[in-house]
A protein has these predicted regions:
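Generic alpha-helical secondary structure signal
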Residues: 8, 32, 47, 93, ...
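Short, low-complexity, Pro/Ser/Thr/Gly-rich segments in the mature regions of secreted, periplasmic
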Residues: 144-158
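An acidic-aromatic
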Residues: 1-28
């Protein structure tokens, strides 16, 4: 992941050691923004329960996976094929944070939770919350590939 810093007028690569740091002062991490890991490729999934349209799935990292979390518990709305909650555990199996998804809307062939709220569980951050609200989504947008270059970071930062 790359970041342009206007103050020093430089584009820097964010090293792996910084991927767990806060993204723009929020409760999200840099890793959350790039989703380096793939749940399907990096985790073993086990169905814990199914009640009506809600399934609870436990995700345990595969032995060779370079992932951040020791375990993730996901509740999924089966009917709409969207997450309801994700509970993240560290490598000591301590519950670290909970993300909730709400306001599911249909956009073309996609069902999308338009609100994501991340709540850290650390005692020093108990009152923190970061909410992301999608006002509009477009899955068919035509985006010029040049937008995804390091040069574009500087060009669009002002």
């Amino acid at each position: 992941m790359w970041q342009y810093i206007p103050k020093i007028e430089r584009t820097i690569k964010i090293p792996p050691s910084m991927m767990l740091q806060s993204w723009m002062g929020s409760d999200f991490t840099n890793d959350d923004m790039v989703k380096e890991s793939s749940l399907e490729e990096d985790y073993h999934a086990k169905l814990l329960s199914k009640k009506g349209n809600i399934a609870t799935i436990e995700l345990i990292p595969k032995e060779d996976a370079a992932v951040v979390w020791g375990k993730i518990i996901v509740t999924v709305d089966i009917k709409n094929a969207v997450p309801v909650t994700e509970t993240f555990y560290d490598d000591m199996m301590k519950k670290v944070r909970v993300m909730t998804f709400s306001k599911v809307e249909q956009h073309g062939s996609h069902r999308v939770p338009m609100v994501m709220e991340l709540r850290p569980l650390d005692a020093s951050k108990k009152k923190n919350r970061t909410k992301v609200i999608f006002e509009e989504v477009n899955f068919d947008a035509k985006i010029d590939p040049s937008y995804f270059t390091k040069q574009a970071l500087k060009r669009y930062s002002r």
